[in-house]
């Protein structure tokens, strides 16, 4: 029997998590909560998507519920997570995708009645972070609130793990060339905490900070303090790319590095770390399920210990798929599946 799940926040990630959950045999989404989107608008937003296209199945509002493929999904509109009646519909696992309740304390408001676990679809300051293909073996059922880290960490960490396990990473710097997200401005506007973040997204390349590289040290402890990074926000609607420059402990040719990544993509990291030999651009990865897709021909080496590696990721779709995978994995370990 699939585990019953709820989604709090029906924004970009919430909606795409639902699309992915419908393809995931272990998850049955029984409820969605969003105080800012009424039911009829939920139908519209789920049906039409400017990036991922129109939903191919049926979606409608009926009897106060959201019906997707003929299946009813309860809809709530509570601002306070503590007031969401997850228990009334039997939702045991909650995807917290508002981007607001990202600490253990705030996300724990969901934990009452039958609710067993909260998966935060964002980095968290204090909740344990888990990245599929990297550190799931560290998961323990005692954790009630966990984080799926960020989309960029999900791209970087599997690549870094393969390289570190095979050749050893002495140190590295990452640049993420990141597509537009909902927090950015269409025209110049106020952004007191991040002045650059207030500049218009449509006609600028915007330098930005990211904690993705440092977060790798949390999921791969042996890399703690060895990686750092920054980001550029660019005027594209989806799909981002990681540029990782590393100094290797064990000398290796670029061909040897490519082969190690290719082998991992076909074995230990299949479905997580992809590998492409095609001549590709960003839109070619829209809807790609992998967390990270290594671009064989885009990287370069200065010598056998200093290399630049390029890996793509659909920061919406691939990340949302990992939210579902993490939920399913946790449920199995917890004995809920």
Swiss-Prot record:
Active site: 151 (nucleophile)
EC number: 1.2.1.12
Biological or metabolic pathway of the protein: Carbohydrate degradation; glycolysis; pyruvate from D-glyceraldehyde 3-phosphate: step 1/5
GO molecular function, one term: NAD binding
Gene3D superfamilies: Dihydrodipicolinate Reductase, domain 2, NAD(P)-binding Rossmann-like Domain
Keyword match Zinc-finger: no
Gene Ontology BP terms: glucose metabolic process; glycolytic process
Catalytic activity: D-glyceraldehyde 3-phosphate + phosphate + NAD(+) = (2R)-3-phospho-glyceroyl phosphate + NADH + H(+)
Recorded family membership: Belongs to the glyceraldehyde-3-phosphate dehydrogenase family.
Assembly mode: Homotetramer.
Protein name: Glyceraldehyde-3-phosphate dehydrogenase
Species name: Phanerodontia chrysosporium (White-rot fungus)
Gene: GPD
């Amino acid at each position: 029997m699939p585990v019953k799940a709820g989604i709090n926040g029906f924004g970009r990630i919430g909606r795409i998590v639902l699309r992915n959950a419908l393809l995931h045999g272990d998850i049955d989404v029984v409820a969605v909560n969003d105080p800012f989107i009424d039911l009829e608008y939920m139908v519209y937003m789920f049906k039409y998507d400017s990036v991922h296209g129109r939903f191919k199945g049926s979606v409608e509002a009926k009897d106060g519920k959201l019906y997707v493929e003929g299946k009813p999904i309860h809809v709530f509109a509570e601002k306070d997570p503590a007031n969401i009646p997850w228990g009334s519909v039997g939702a045991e696992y909650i995807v917290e995708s508002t981007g607001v309740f990202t600490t253990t304390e705030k996300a724990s408001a969901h934990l009452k009645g039958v609710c067993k676990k909260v998966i935060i679809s964002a980095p968290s300051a204090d909740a344990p972070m888990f990245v599929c293909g990297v550190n799931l073996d560290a998961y323990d059922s005692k954790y009630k609130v966990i984080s799926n880290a960020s989309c960029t960490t999900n791209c970087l960490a599997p690549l870094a793990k393969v390289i570190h396990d095979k050749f050893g990473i002495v140190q590295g710097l990452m640049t993420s060339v990141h597509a537009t997200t909902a927090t950015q401005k269409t025209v110049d506007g106020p952004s007191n905490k991040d002045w650059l973040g207030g500049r218009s997204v449509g006609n600028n390349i915007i330098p930005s900070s990211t904690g993705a590289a440092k977060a790798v040290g949390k999921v791969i402890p042996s890399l703690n303090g060895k990686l750092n990074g920054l980001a550029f926000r660019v005027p594209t609607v989806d799909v981002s790319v990681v540029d990782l420059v590393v100094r290797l402990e064990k000398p290796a040719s670029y061909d040897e590095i490519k082969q190690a990544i290719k082998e991992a993509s076909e074995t230990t990291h299949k479905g997580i770390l992809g590998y492409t030999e095609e001549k590709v651009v960003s839109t070619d990865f829209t809807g790609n399920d992998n967390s990270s897709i290594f671009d064989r021909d885009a990287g370069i080496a200065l010598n056998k210990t200093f290399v630049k590696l390029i890996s793509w990721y659909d920061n919406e779709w691939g990340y949302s798929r990992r939210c579902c995978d993490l939920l399913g994995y946790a449920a199995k370990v917890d004995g809920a599946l």
